[in-house]
């Protein structure tokens, strides 16, 4: 069976990025071409998906979710569509990524792995995830500790909060995930049934946090046994741009670089003619 790379992009396919109206998205074609070139290089299919690919999802626009939230829910909806294909595994990559010229084939690198994803250690996000799982989704007991202690690293590891910037899943994992997750036709009812349709915003450790894809994935981890397949994805596959480019001689090697936040996107635009940056990435 073959593999596929998915990227979510809700901008129009004919978007004119020279138009001032798209100024804030001027980074998109550079990242998109980097990811597409990588897919061609490793000879896998490359699919760009958006909210518009899910006609049954359009009712979501009647409710008070941000565009970002609605876009992240696509990471749940597409799992159902993946199961209708013949692909063996997928890698989902966030749009705001660029690929190193030295990056190996992500599927060959993880040929024996079914579920690769980084842990999400942000304390406020883990706490937010815990509240949604316990008080809204009723997926875990009120007294459950959402961390497990890793004796080897002497560190608390989140059970249900994983990082969705870059991840790999096999058909076996996805088949279990979709058995409990809503699809494009049921997600609105799912949100209603769990008192999430009014988009509650939580105050957690001084930060405002809302319900997104990570929380729905956490729900699936709690309701199934898929985490038995999970292995932590290495940092080089979801590296932050500061460590890749802004540490001088201490810059770290990477395979996929994540241009997180507005600063990350601006960094790329500011360095399109800088060989110290561009010689490292394929755009």
Regions found by a protein language model. Name each.
Residues 1-77, 81-86, 257-264, 268, ...:
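N-terminal anchoring/stem segment of glycosyltransferases
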Residues 7, 45-50, 91-94, 99, ...:
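A structural signal for short, well-ordered beta-strand segments and their strand-loop junctions
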Residues 14-15, 55-58, 99-102, 107-108, ...:
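Short catalytic/ligand-binding loop motif for oxyanion handling, primarily in non-cytosolic enzymes
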Residues 62-66, 130-136, 245-255, 272:
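Short, surface-exposed amphipathic charged segments that create phosphate/polyanion-binding patches used
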Residues 107, 131-139, 181-192:
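Short, surface-exposed, charged loop/turn segments at secondary-structure junctions
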Residues 154-271:
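Catalytic core and acceptor-binding pocket of nucleotide-sugar-dependent glycosyltransferases
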């Amino acid at each position: 069976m073959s593999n596929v790379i998915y990227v979510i992009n809700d901008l129009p396919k004919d978007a004119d990025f020279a138009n001032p109206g798209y100024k804030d998205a001027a980074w998109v074609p550079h990242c998109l071409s980097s990811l597409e070139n990588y897919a061609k290089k490793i000879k896998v299919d490359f699919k760009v998906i958006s909210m518009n690919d899910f006609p049954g999802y359009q009712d979501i626009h009647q409710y008070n979710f941000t565009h970002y939230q609605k876009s992240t829910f696509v990471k749940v909806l597409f799992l159902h569509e993946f199961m209708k294909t013949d692909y063996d595994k997928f890698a989902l990559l966030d749009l705001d990524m660029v690929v190193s010229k030295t990056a190996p084939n992500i599927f060959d690198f993880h040929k024996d792995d079914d579920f690769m994803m980084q842990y999400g250690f942000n304390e406020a996000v883990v706490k937010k995830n815990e509240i949604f799982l316990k008080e809204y989704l009723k997926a875990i007991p009120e007294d459950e500790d959402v961390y497990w202690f890793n004796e080897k690293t002497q560190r608390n590891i989140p059970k249900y909060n994983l990082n969705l910037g870059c991840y790999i899943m096999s058909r076996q994992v996805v088949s279990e995930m979709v058995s409990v997750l809503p699809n494009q036709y049921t997600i609105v009812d799912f949100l209603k049934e769990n008192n999430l349709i009014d988009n509650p915003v939580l105050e957690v450790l001084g930060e405002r946090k809302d319900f997104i894809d990570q929380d729905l994935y956490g729900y699936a981890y709690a309701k199934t046994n898929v985490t038995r397949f999970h292995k932590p994805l290495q940092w080089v596959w979801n590296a932050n741009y500061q460590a890749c480019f802004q540490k001088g001689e201490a810059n770290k090697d990477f395979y996929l670089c994540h241009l997180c936040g507005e600063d990350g996107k601006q960094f790329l635009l500011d360095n399109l003619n800088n060989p110290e940056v561009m010689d490292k990435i394929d755009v």
